């Protein structure tokens, strides 16, 4: 039996939240992301006035492929699930609460081509 090789690709992105005192939703569009989603990792900083974040991967038409539910702040989170990626997706990150300074949430999407 021949060995199989999988081309695992990592797509790194950042969602930057402005200083704000309301719920903030940041959408980042990722293009040329064709293949099977394998897992997603993201890291949240110590956020002020909130205790959770949420990340979603959506199709351009608004359908949700992936929804993390709420995830604690100040953590690196990994969640795996397999679904097809159609080429262009929106990564939607939601944070609630007051931020006195801009904050970055970084994410890595891993998929096979």
Where are these predicted regions, by residue range?
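Extracellular and analogous surface-interaction loops
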Residues: 26-35, 80-85, 112
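Noncatalytic modules at the cell exterior or secretory-pathway interfaces
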Residues: 34-42, 83-104
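Exposed low-complexity, polar/acidic, P/S/T/G-rich flexible segments that act as propeptides
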Residues: 102-113
């Amino acid at each position: 039996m021949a060995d199989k090789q999988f081309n695992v690709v990592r797509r790194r992105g950042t969602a930057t939240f402005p200083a704000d005192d309301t719920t903030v939703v940041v959408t980042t569009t990722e293009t040329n992301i064709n293949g099977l989603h394998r897992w997603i990792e993201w890291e949240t900083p110590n956020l002020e006035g909130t205790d959770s974040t949420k990340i979603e991967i959506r199709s351009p038409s608004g359908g949700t492929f992936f929804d993390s539910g709420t995830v604690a702040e100040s953590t690196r989170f990994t969640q795996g699930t397999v679904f097809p990626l159609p080429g262009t997706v929106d990564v939607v990150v939601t944070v609630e609460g007051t931020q006195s300074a801009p904050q970055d949430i970084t994410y890595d999407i891993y998929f096979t081509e």
